[in-house]
């Protein structure tokens, strides 16, 4: 049975919840109870798979955040806490020295406060693995104990004796106890780019097996982060441990004299290739109390500065359906703000209506998001579904296409606005000082009932629009007037003419409108599908009406 399930859980009350929205959900008591029960049951299912089968069905950091979310909800609604989450991670073997754990901080301001009255501070990467106690008798490995609940753990001695990274015989015949992290070896792992890579779950699952194979044992490394009964000074402890035969941590132990120093090493290790996954850095004073006084709770002499999550758990507030110029429907999720790589994310695209239908995302659902290419928010999965499934006004894909919504009729507002934005943009008429916000203002006033109504707007009408000053109105009027001088080919693109490849285009609307599908297909680079689209475009009644409007306005080619 896996012994050290989710080692951080014992210290949930000490986490800062900056990743999540500060406000509590606006739920009635019954709803709050059902949502908490649903999340608890989901976590229990993850735990069961992790305990009984040694497999992780969710990324480590999403599990961590789900636990935080559960704790937050319980605090919001004063709901009783469940039994101690590490109760199943405890074991029959007592630790001679307690594992303390760490306070987890996320903000530089909190770190600055912590550093203010401390001296002789050192920083190390916070290796993302599973904690262990190693006990030596006369220089020989005697026992390995899982962290468990910090006081008692499981006996891992049999597995430890197969792990090459753990010295089986020290260079000196000494009685010794060290605490450290068993981690999954990674080659050139860059935390900022690759995230946790489920490294913690991997090594925990292997150590939970009854028989650790040689190949898997070779993939496990050791990072010793404390020698409770060692010399008073931290550099002395590290030097001596290296001389005893433990893997050196000297390159990963740096002096900190200021917040800038801590920030430097945190950023450096976050973006540098390392042989292990990390989830932050650990700041620790060189001097600490005698080991006999240590307790299974965060100490005052060490603290963790967590990295931003590479994958965040986000609460869905609303689901919008954005309809583009060509009728493509893109669902967009409005989220409670979350932080990813020090960026605040408030919305994410679901990519397509079909994907949204497969995922069936509703307000109140919890979703996993990340940054694609470290820049673009990306929806990864649904982590938890809300117990109440909100009704949504979902547009029908069959109602929207390249020739729909030439007026802002009910249901067409999104596509109509997209048509206007395209028309004035660089792909269309390239009108200066005209953008999406301009069209939104005009639509709010009811002055646009078709795609080209703006051609007849005059100065007094624009001046009466809220938010448009005299100067803005004058510039806008000049842009609208200049549109009449744009070339015919530019107007065709602005109206949404399907791509024509290498086809030769006549310089008049009448000539193009007379072409049938076969004539379009005879042009270079135009296949049957595109030919049908072009033929339909020039025969559409709404498009024909627009061409007549442009002819009356004196636009060349119409």
Swiss-Prot record:
Domain of life according to the entry: Bacteria
Xref: NCBIfam families: PRK08097.1
Alphabetized GO MF terms: DNA ligase (NAD+) activity
Keywords: DNA damage, DNA repair, DNA replication, Ligase, NAD
Stated name of the protein: DNA ligase B
Example GO biological process: DNA replication
Role this protein plays: Catalyzes the formation of phosphodiester linkages between 5'-phosphoryl and 3'-hydroxyl groups in double-stranded DNA using NAD as a coenzyme and as the energy source for the reaction.
Active site (UniProt): 126
PROSITE patterns cross-referenced by the UniProt entry: DNA_LIGASE_N2
Catalysed transformations (reactions): NAD(+) + (deoxyribonucleotide)n-3'-hydroxyl + 5'-phospho-(deoxyribonucleotide)m = (deoxyribonucleotide)n+m + AMP + beta-nicotinamide D-nucleotide
EC number(s) given by UniProt: 6.5.1.2
Enzyme kind, highest EC tier: ligase
InterPro entries: DNA_ligase (IPR001679), DNA_ligase_B (IPR020923), DNA_ligase_CS (IPR033136), DNAligase_adenylation (IPR013839), DNAligase_N (IPR013840), NA-bd_OB-fold (IPR012340), NAD_dep_DNA_ligaseB (IPR050326), NAD_DNA_ligase_OB (IPR004150)
Family: Belongs to the NAD-dependent DNA ligase family. LigB subfamily.
Keyword Transmembrane tagged: no
HAMAP family in the record: DNA_ligase_B
Keyword NAD annotated: yes
């Amino acid at each position: 049975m896996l012994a050290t399930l989710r080692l951080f859980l014992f210290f949930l009350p000490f986490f800062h919840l900056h990743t999540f929205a500060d406000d509590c959900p606006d739920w009635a008591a019954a709803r709050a109870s059902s949502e908490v029960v649903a999340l608890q049951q989901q976590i229990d299912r993850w735990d069961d798979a992790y305990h009984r089968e040694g497999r992780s069905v969710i990324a480590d950091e999403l599990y961590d955040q789900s636990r935080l979310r559960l704790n937050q909800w319980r605090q919001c609604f004063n709901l009783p806490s469940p039994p101690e989450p590490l109760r199943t991670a405890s074991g029959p073997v007592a630790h001679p020295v307690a594992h303390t754990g760490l306070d987890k901080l996320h903000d530089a301001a909190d770190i600055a406060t912590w550093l203010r009255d401390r001296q002789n501070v050192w920083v190390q990467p916070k290796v993302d693995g599973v904690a262990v106690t190693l006990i030596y008798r006369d220089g020989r490995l005697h026992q390995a104990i899982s962290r468990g609940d910090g006081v008692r753990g499981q006996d891992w001695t049999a597995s430890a004796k197969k792990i090459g990274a753990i010295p089986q015989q020290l260079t000196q015949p000494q009685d010794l106890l060290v605490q450290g992290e068993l981690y999954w070896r990674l080659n050139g792992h860059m935390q900022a780019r690759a995230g946790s890579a489920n490294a913690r779950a991997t090594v925990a699952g292997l150590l939970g097996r009854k028989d650790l194979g040689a190949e898997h044992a070779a993939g496990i490394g050791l990072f010793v982060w404390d020698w409770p009964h060692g010399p008073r000074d931290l550099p002395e402890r590290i030097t001596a441990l290296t001389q005893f035969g433990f893997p050196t941590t000297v390159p990963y132990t740096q002096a900190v004299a200021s917040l800038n120093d801590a920030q430097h090493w945190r950023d450096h290790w976050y973006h540098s290739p390392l042989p292990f996954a990390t989830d932050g850095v650990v700041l620790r004073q060189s001097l600490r109390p005698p080991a006999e006084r240590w307790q299974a709770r965060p100490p005052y002499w060490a603290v963790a500065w967590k990295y931003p999550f590479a994958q965040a758990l986000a609460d869905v507030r609303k689901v919008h359906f954005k309809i583009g110029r060509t009728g493509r429907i893109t669902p967009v999720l409005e989220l409670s703000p979350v932080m990813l790589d020090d960026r605040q994310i408030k919305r994410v695209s679901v990519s397509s209506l079909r994907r949204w239908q497969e995922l069936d995302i509703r307000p109140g659902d919890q979703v996993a998001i990340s940054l694609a290419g470290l820049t673009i928010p990306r929806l990864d999965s649904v982590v938890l579904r809300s117990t109440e499934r909100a009704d949504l006004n979902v547009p029908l894909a069959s109602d929207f296409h390249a020739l729909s919504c030439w007026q802002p009729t009910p249901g067409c507002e999104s596509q109509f606005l997209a048509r206007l934005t395209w028309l004035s943009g660089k792909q269309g008429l390239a009108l200066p000082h005209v953008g999406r916000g301009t069209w939104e203002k005009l639509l709010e006033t009811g002055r646009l009932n078709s795609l080209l109504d703006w051609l007849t707007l005059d100065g007094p009408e624009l001046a009466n629009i809220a938010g448009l000053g005299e100067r803005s109105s004058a510039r806008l009027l000049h842009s609208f007037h200049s549109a009449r001088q744009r070339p015919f080919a530019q107007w065709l693109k602005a109206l949404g003419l399907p791509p024509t490849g290498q086809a030769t285009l006549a310089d008049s609307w009448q000539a193009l409108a007379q072409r049938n599908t076969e004539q379009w297909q005879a042009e270079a680079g135009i296949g049957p599908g595109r030919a049908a689209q072009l033929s339909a475009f020039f025969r559409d009644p709404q498009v024909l009406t627009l061409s007549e409007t442009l002819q009356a306005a004196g636009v060349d080619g119409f």
